[in-house]
């Protein structure tokens, strides 16, 4: 959740632990609260626990069955 605080400063919830994070240069890991939460998130992406939804992702898995693969 994003909330507005004084002086045009925003607070967001850390995506991992849900702690409030002030959105400013003083929060170097934003939107995460810490390096630890940042690395947990990176690990989830690396382990393919997270992914961006895509309807046409299968072509990349088997280039031999996709004629367009050779053109790129």
Swiss-Prot record:
| Cofactor binding, per record | Binds 1 zinc ion.
Asked if the record carries the keyword Metal-binding, the reply is yes
| Pfam families per UniProt | YacG (PF03884)
Annotated GO biological processes are: regulation of DNA-templated transcription
Q: Which UniProt keywords apply?
A: Metal-binding, Zinc
Indicate which residues the UniProt annotation says bind Zn(2+).
14, 17, 33, 37
Q: Which cofactor does it need?
A: Zn(2+)
Q: Which GO terms describe its molecular function?
A: DNA topoisomerase type II (double strand cut, ATP-hydrolyzing) inhibitor activity; zinc ion binding
Q: Which Gene3D superfamilies match?
A: Erythroid Transcription Factor GATA-1, subunit A (3.30.50.10)
What binding partners and quaternary form does the record give? Interacts with GyrB.
Please name the PANTHER family in this protein's record: DNA GYRASE INHIBITOR YACG
What does the record give as the function of this protein? Answer: Inhibits all the catalytic activities of DNA gyrase by preventing its interaction with DNA. Acts by binding directly to the C-terminal domain of GyrB, which probably disrupts DNA binding by the gyrase.
HAMAP family in the record, alphabetically?
DNA_gyrase_inhibitor_YacG
* Family stated for the protein in its record: Belongs to the DNA gyrase inhibitor YacG family.
The identity of this protein, by name, is: DNA gyrase inhibitor YacG
Organism the protein comes from: Mannheimia succiniciproducens (strain KCTC 0769BP / MBEL55E)
- Gene name in the database record: yacG
């Amino acid at each position: 959740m994003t909330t507005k605080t004084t002086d045009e400063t925003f607070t967001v919830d850390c995506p991992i632990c849900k702690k409030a994070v002030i959105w400013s240069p003083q929060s170097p890991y934003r939107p995460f609260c810490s390096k630890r939460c940042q690395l947990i998130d990176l690990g989830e992406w690396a382990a393919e626990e997270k992914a961006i939804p895509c309807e046409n992702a299968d072509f990349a898995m088997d280039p031999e069955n996709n004629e367009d693969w050779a053109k790129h």
